[in-house]
C-alpha cells in the first residue's frame, strides 16, 4: 500500500487540484491493498533484488523505450521473468530486450501520424497496463503522465521499470475511475478499454469528467463495420477475451461522443490487428492472437480505430 500512496502523493504534487480527493484516495488504496493479488509481495521481493541502476541514458521518444547502462543481464532477465506475462512494450533495459506481446509502438505511431500531440500537457492514461505509454507521453513532451489500472501485476511491472527509467513525472495509480474520480487533465486517453466496459456511455462520461473543458479525449478501441446504429456484442468470448461487451462502428462511437457533448476532431481508419502487432514471445507464458483467431474463424476480424474528440 505504501507504494500506491507514494504514487498518489506524487500525482498530487504534479496536479495540486487532485488534493481534494486525498481522503478518498487513502480509503481507496487501503481497500485495494486488502484485495491485492496474492503474489504481490513476491513481485515486490523480485523488484527489490534488482540492482540500483544509474542509467547512462534514457530514450523515451522512440519505439523501443530504452535505458542504457551496465548491469548483470542474466540477473535482470531472471528477475523480470518473475513478473511475466509482459503485455505492452517493447523495452530495452540495460541490454535486456523486453519483447512484449503487444508492439504498442505501432499504436502510438498511428497517433503520431495523425498529428496527435501531448507536448506541454497533463495526460491521463486510463487502463495504462505497465506504463509503456506513460514513458512515450513524456518522450513526446508531456508535462506529466498519470496512469490508472487496477492490475497489481502491471503495477509491479511499472515499479520494476521505474528502477531503470526513474521518471518522477510518470505516476501509476492502481485503481479505476469507478473508485477514484480524477479531473483536471488536458488530455485523457483510453486505449483498449472501452470494449471491456458493460456500460460504455457511463465510462465515456467518467472520462469526460477527467478532461478539462477544451481538452482532448482519445478513444482507441476495437470496432466493426457499419453505420451509426451498428454495435456488435459477442455471444461469449472475442479473440480470446471473455470480458468484451460492445464493439461499435466508428460512426456509432462518434454518435456516443457527440451525445456526451464532445466535438469530433479526428476519426482514424480502422486497422486490422495482425500477428505482427500482437503475438506470443518468450515474455508471454500464454496464448496470443494467432491462437485465438483459429478458435473463432467466423467472428468479425479484430480491427482497431481511434477517435480524438474535444470536450465542449
UniProtKB/Swiss-Prot annotation:
Gene3D superfamilies: Vaccinia Virus protein VP39. InterPro entries: CmoB, Mo5U34_MeTrfas-like, SAM-dependent_MTases_sf. Signal peptide: none annotated. SUPFAM superfamilies: S-adenosyl-L-methionine-dependent methyltransferases. Carboxy-S-adenosyl-L-methionine binds at residues 88, 102, 107, 127, 149-151, 177-178, 191, 195, 304. It is an enzyme of class 2 (transferase). It catalyses: carboxy-S-adenosyl-L-methionine + 5-hydroxyuridine(34) in tRNA = 5-carboxymethoxyuridine(34) in tRNA + S-adenosyl-L-homocysteine + H(+). Keywords: Transferase, tRNA processing. GO terms for biological process: tRNA wobble uridine modification. Its EC number is 2.5.1.-. One of its GO terms (molecular function) is transferase activity, transferring alkyl or aryl (other than methyl) groups. The keyword Electron transport does not apply. It holds the Pfam family Methyltransf_9. Belongs to the class I-like SAM-binding methyltransferase superfamily. CmoB family. NCBIfam families: PRK15068.1, tRNA 5-methoxyuridine(34)/uridine 5-oxyacetic acid(34) synthase CmoB. HAMAP family: tRNA_carboxymethyltr_CmoB. Catalyzes carboxymethyl transfer from carboxy-S-adenosyl-L-methionine (Cx-SAM) to 5-hydroxyuridine (ho5U) to form 5-carboxymethoxyuridine (cmo5U) at position 34 in tRNAs. PANTHER family: METHYLTRANSFERASE, TRNA U34 CARBOXYMETHYLTRANSFERASE. Homotetramer. This is tRNA U34 carboxymethyltransferase. The lineage of its organism: Bacteria, Pseudomonadati, Pseudomonadota, Gammaproteobacteria, Cardiobacteriales. The gene is cmoB.
Amino acid at each position: 500500500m505504501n507504494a500506491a500512496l507514494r504514487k498518489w502523493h506524487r500525482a498530487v504534487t504534479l496536479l495540486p487540484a487532485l488534493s481534494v480527493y486525498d481522503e478518498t484516495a487513502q480509503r481507496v488504496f487501503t481497500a485495494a491493498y486488502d484485495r491485492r493479488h496474492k503474489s504481490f509481495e513476491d513481485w515486490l521481493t523480485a523488484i527489490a533484488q534488482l540492482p540500483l541502476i544509474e542509467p547512462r541514458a534514457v530514450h523515451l521518444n522512440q519505439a523501443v523505450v530504452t535505458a542504457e547502462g551496465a548491469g548483470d543481464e542474466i540477473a535482470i532477465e531472471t528477475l523480470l521473468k518473475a513478473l511475466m506475462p509482459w503485455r505492452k512494450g517493447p523495452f530495452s533495459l540495460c541490454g535486456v530486450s523486453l519483447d512484449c506481446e503487444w508492439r504498442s509502438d505501432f499504436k502510438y505511431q498511428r497517433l503520431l501520424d495523425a498529428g496527435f500531440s501531448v507536448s506541454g500537457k497533463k495526460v491521463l492514461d486510463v487502463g495504462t497496463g505497465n506504463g509503456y505509454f506513460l514513458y512515450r507521453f513524456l518522450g513526446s513532451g508531456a508535462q506529466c503522465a498519470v496512469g490508472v489500472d487496477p492490475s497489481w501485476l502491471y503495477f509491479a511491472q511499472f515499479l520494476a521499470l521505474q528502477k531503470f527509467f526513474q521518471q518522477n513525472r510518470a505516476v501509476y495509480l492502481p485503481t479505476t475511475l469507478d473508485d477514484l474520480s480524477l479531473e483536471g487533465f488536458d488530455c485523457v486517453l483510453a486505449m483498449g478499454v472501452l470494449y471491456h466496459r458493460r456500460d460504455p456511455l457511463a465510462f465515456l462520461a467518467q472520462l469526460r469528467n477527467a478532461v478539462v473543458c477544451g481538452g482532448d479525449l482519445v478513444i482507441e478501441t476495437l470496432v466493426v463495420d457499419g453505420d451509426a446504429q451498428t454495435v456488435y456484442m459477442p455471444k461469449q468470448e472475442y479473440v480470446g477475451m471473455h470480458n468484451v461487451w460492445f464493439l461499435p462502428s466508428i460512426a456509432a462511437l462518434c454518435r456516443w461522443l457527440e451525445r456526451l457533448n464532445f466535438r469530433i476532431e479526428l476519426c482514424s481508419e480502422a486497422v486490422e490487428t495482425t500477428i505482427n502487432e500482437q503475438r506470443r514471445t518468450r515474455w508471454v507464458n500464454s496464448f496470443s492472437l494467432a491462437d485465438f483467431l483459429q478458435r473463432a474463424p467466423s467472428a468479425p476480424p479484430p480491427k482497431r480505430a481511434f477517435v480524438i474528440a474535444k470536450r465542449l
